[in-house]
């Protein structure tokens, strides 16, 4: 509505601008000034309305954001209501204890057990050294002649020969 009035006033200003009669021109100029004043007021009103519209949109956006943040806070609080930091610490300690116990059990199960045979560590080391020394001694005693390696089969027919290339002689 204000936009239509604005257009109407602009047309009136243009119409009154071109009059040649001095008293009529003076009257037209007065009307033009009034119309320009009304036009400025309408422009200011439209600007204020646009500003208010943007402010209202921003307020609605802020309201929605706050509602969502409140809902998120309530949901988080509900999720944490059943949790207590002491209970969480206790639970984490129980998990760590059970993990440690499981590792101890695995280590105990994987240890070799002699089932009544107790061997002295020094005796085992001495026996291992003897076995390690026997292997090189055996290799030294078993020196044999050269090994025979079977040769590949050779064709029994004559292969075609290539013609000899002639060499260029330079003089």
UniProtKB/Swiss-Prot annotation:
Cellular component, GO, one term: lysosomal membrane
Residues spanning the signal sequence: none
Pfam family, one: Snf7
Superkingdom assignment: Eukaryota
Compositional bias segments (type: Basic and acidic residues): 1-17
Region feature (Disordered): 1-24, 132-171
Gene Ontology biological process: autophagosome maturation; late endosome to lysosome transport; late endosome to vacuole transport via multivesicular body sorting pathway; midbody abscission; mitotic metaphase chromosome alignment; nuclear membrane reassembly; plasma membrane repair; regulation of mitotic spindle assembly
Family that this chain belongs to: Belongs to the SNF7 family.
Name of this protein: Putative charged multivesicular body protein 4B-like protein CHMP4BP1
Naturally occurring in which organism (per UniProt): Homo sapiens (Human)
Organism ancestry: Eukaryota, Metazoa, Chordata, Craniata, Vertebrata
